[in-house]
């Protein structure tokens, strides 16, 4: 029986759903012993509690020396990576330790947080969660080829319901979205897309997710006269109940978003919903246009898709049936577990080596810079904040400048950049 130690920053959002479903599936299989170590106390305990119910050992540990001891005891160590500054701090503090290291990247690495090619060589096995990562626009041909030959790809799939899809009757035509409401993930022109179809009879837009960006979305929607057609559910634990009350699932993401497997999109497809997503990034590797959903490129194409689906409920039903069958056949926690077991089998054939993360950067601000895509990194080269920054770097979380500065308060460079951003935004900069 192999001892496999998973190290994650937290159990929030999509990662929490994936890890709880995956580790519960491993526990049900028997065989290997999996243990989960968190670097932060869970803010929401729903996924954490699911692990306890499944008999999976999970606890919080922040002492790097104690974690190193656990790593040395394990046969395999799997890092759950999305460039969270708490994980960065742990790796910078980690003493030398021998391990068979697997790094499972829960971000595409195509934009920010970027994946430097050299970082892929640190673990014995680097594992992507989307085929889109192989097409990183800031790698050259040789780097893409190396990734294709040496990095694995395992979709980070959570546990989807096996129940037959149910649709609850409701008034109007419900166009739904579930996920992060920050414009770092949601398309910055989301309300502009919605405005194209606001005259559809009874249409309303149901947004499910933490309400931290609700005021801004409402403000952006006001000029389009959309205020009465926006409905915010806030964070919910029963996503399935929300999906049952939707007619179409509209997944309009920032063209430079960081996502990969997009479990909530797959969950909507599993629920038998007709999905409309942008023809970009990871989404185009998950939705088959015209078969399991619709892919659009512009607000005009989105309008055409929504009007078509409104006018033809039988088309919504066809796409939903196909989507459900596609998820059943191609995306399951069992398949994810099997693919990861194959990775573990390969890694076990190798000897433990000393974990060395010094190549990430010698200082926290250097690590931050090294995981920016090259054009953004060049903008910081003069020591000040570039005038134009993507939304993800301006926020409070999601590995933003201020997020890094909070975790590394002694790093004067990071703190200076954070102060500059706060001053700009206080003066009306966005």
Would you name each region that the model predicts?
Residues 74-76, 244-260, 273:
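Acidic donor-binding loop of glycosyltransferase active sites
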Residues 289-290, 294-300, 308-313:
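Conserved acidic donor-binding segment of nucleotide-sugar-dependent glycosyltransferases
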Residues 53-57, 217-236:
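Nucleotide-activated donor-binding/catalytic signature segment of Leloir-type glycosyltransferases, i.e.
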Residues 16-24, 173, 182-196:
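A conserved mid-protein helix/loop that constitutes part of the nucleotide-sugar donor-binding site
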Residues 329, 334, 338-430:
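C-terminal amphipathic helix plus adjacent low-complexity
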Residues 252-266, 278-285:
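Nucleotide-sugar-dependent
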Residues 37-38, 270, 274-277:
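Short hydrophobic beta-strand element within catalytic cores of glycosyltransferases
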